[in-house]
């Protein structure tokens, strides 16, 4: 069930991230927006991650994304999380990478 929900929603999440971040919204704000709802299990994952970050019950965004990668069941969602993690740890061009993922 989780895998099916991830597969169904990941393309919409990718497109939303593309639009938000191309408009100048930062990664954390984009994650917060997606966590607000409308994207199934991915919204739940992002919402709980942001709650832990806000409460200080986390070691940071990078480790949180790494944890979600091990929890992800679908390849597309895992790839998106890996892209986000790489951007946080190595400061890569996330917008271009997300656009490429959205066209696959």
Where are these regions (language model features)?
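Juxtamembrane/interface alpha-helical elements of multi-pass membrane proteins
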Residues: 1-66, 79
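Hydrophobic alpha-helical signal-anchor/transmembrane segments
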Residues: 1-12, 73, 89, 93-96, ...
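Hydrophobic alpha-helical transmembrane segments
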Residues: 62-88, 93, 98
């Amino acid at each position: 069930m989780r895998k099916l929900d991830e597969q169904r929603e990941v393309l919409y999440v990718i497109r939303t991230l593309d639009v938000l971040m191309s408009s100048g919204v930062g990664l954390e704000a984009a994650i917060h927006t997606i966590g607000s709802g409308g994207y199934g299990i991915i919204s739940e994952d992002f919402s709980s991650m942001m709650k832990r970050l806000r409460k200080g019950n986390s070691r940071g965004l990078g480790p949180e994304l790494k944890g979600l990668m091990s929890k992800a069941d679908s390849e597309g969602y895992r790839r998106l999380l890996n892209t986000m993690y790489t951007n946080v740890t190595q400061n890569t061009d996330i917008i271009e990478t997300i656009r490429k993922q959205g066209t696959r």
